[in-house]
């Protein structure tokens, strides 16, 4: 997924530059690093861990901590990427490409989840959406001729929530996993040795 989002980010940078939006090479590299590392704080089972094993810390906060640790090892080479990730950089559209209503993360995971679940209604034209993006007053905007593509994106996202993310089987499996992890956490805190597969 991170590589897919990275690819879409590269496409978005190329498209925005072709419309006369000036993006320094250092900014392009930084926003690509930010999208590549945006989910580094996700553990296995995605958001389930946020509600069980790790309490009170979001995966975004963990991602930021890990990015800062990597940045220290790289002697500050991720400074700009971290600024963009934290929305502290003046060109707000760069952050919006990483984390916004039409970010490269969402464009990738919707297409990817649609493909792997077989729910064709979730399929979106990410290439078309990227081509319709532009920048106005340092914020991401959509050209008027792209409105239909955005409506399709929003509809597809809603359908994916109804048919996949909030499907009764998905919700039941998530609840079972949460119960299992909470029980394992409880037993481990009591000193009970738990079997874990070496795989």
Model-derived regions: residue spans:
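Histidine-centered, transition-metal-coordinating active-site segments
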Residues: 1-30, 42-199
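Active-site rim/loop-helix segments in enzyme catalytic domains that contact anionic ligands
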Residues: 39
